[in-house]
Amino acid sequence: MKRIMLFLVTNLAVMLVLGVVLNILFSVLGINKSSISGLLVFCAVFGFGGSFISLLMSKWMAKRSYGVQVIEQPRNETEHWLVSTVARQAREAGIKMPEVGIYDSPEMNAFATGARRDDSLVAVSSGLLYSMSRDEAEAVLAHEVSHVANGDMVTLTLIQGVVNTFVMFFARIVAGVISNFFSSNNDEESSSTGGFAYMITVFVLEMLFGVLASIIVMWFSRQREFRADAGAAKLAGRDKMIAALQRLSRGAEPQLEGSMMAFGINGKRSMSELFMSHPPIEQRIAALRG
């Protein structure tokens, strides 16, 4: 329930902010809202705006959605090891020390998030800390630090923004063509019905184009995972990273959602690899082994 409320409130706030930004842009640039240029600006504002606002709020959302307890002062040996390990890896990767946190979950997983390389969060599940060896956990942390060092959060946000923009744009263009084709007259009843049909068509096309576009986003995500694995192998050692992946392959399916899933150590399985945010573990191990 808490996650649902956060989702609804956040999306409402995003819509309000983007609506204000859109009106300002139309006024300043003098763009006709009903023109193709106006439609493209509308789609770009909501396509990129939603992605970037989500990125800016990602740390805040992650902490509240998953109940991440940021370690301000280590209280035990495990927390001390966790903080010191991330600090060492961040130094070697050339980034500022991320915030480090733990969230309560029996699954073995971790994620990184944050709007900038020097303003990030690395969070691990309690299940990972208690189920993995120190060497395996070190490799997982190195994987997340590599995501931060590689700037993966911003990269995928840009890709998602481009995809969102064109999904919205082409859905409305195609819906307009279909609506014009089937409209027979311009009386009030037809206009009202046509407007409703247009909105339904836009919704259906956005769903369809969104599914197709997600293939592109997921492909980029899988490439970033291979790169993060390679970075982890440099920071923690190839054998440790392979051992961590082998341990993950024997664990339960992860429960992270949305952008947290994209930057977790392990992703959900899918009927098709095209829609997976992470490559199959056997492929990741094979890539590390060369």
Swiss-Prot record:
Instruction: Identify the residues that bind Zn(2+).
Output: 143, 147, 225
Could you confirm whether the keyword Transmembrane appears in this record?
yes
Cofactor details (free text)? Binds 1 zinc ion per subunit.
Q: Where does this one sit in the cell? A: Cell inner membrane
Enzyme category, top tier: hydrolase
List, alphabetically, the GO terms of the cellular component aspect.
plasma membrane
Ranges annotated as spanning the membrane: 6-26, 36-56, 158-178, 200-220
Q: EC no.?
A: 3.4.24.-
Enumerate the active-site residues: 144
Give membrane topology per the record: Multi-pass membrane protein
Q: Tell me a GO biological process for this protein.
A: proteolysis
Q: Does the keyword Metal-binding apply?
A: yes
Disulfide bridges in this chain: none
Instruction: Enumerate the cofactors the protein uses.
Output: Zn(2+)
Task: Say which domain of life the source belongs to.
Answer: Bacteria
| Single GO MF descriptor | zinc ion binding
Principal subcellular localization: membrane
Q: Which keywords describe this protein according to UniProt? A: Cell inner membrane, Cell membrane, Hydrolase, Membrane, Metal-binding, Metalloprotease, Protease, Transmembrane, Transmembrane helix, Zinc
Family per UniProt? Belongs to the peptidase M48B family.
The cross-references to PANTHER family, in alphabetical order and at most eight, read: PROTEASE HTPX
Entry protein name: Protease HtpX
Ranked from the top, the taxonomy reads: Bacteria, Pseudomonadati, Pseudomonadota, Gammaproteobacteria, Aeromonadales
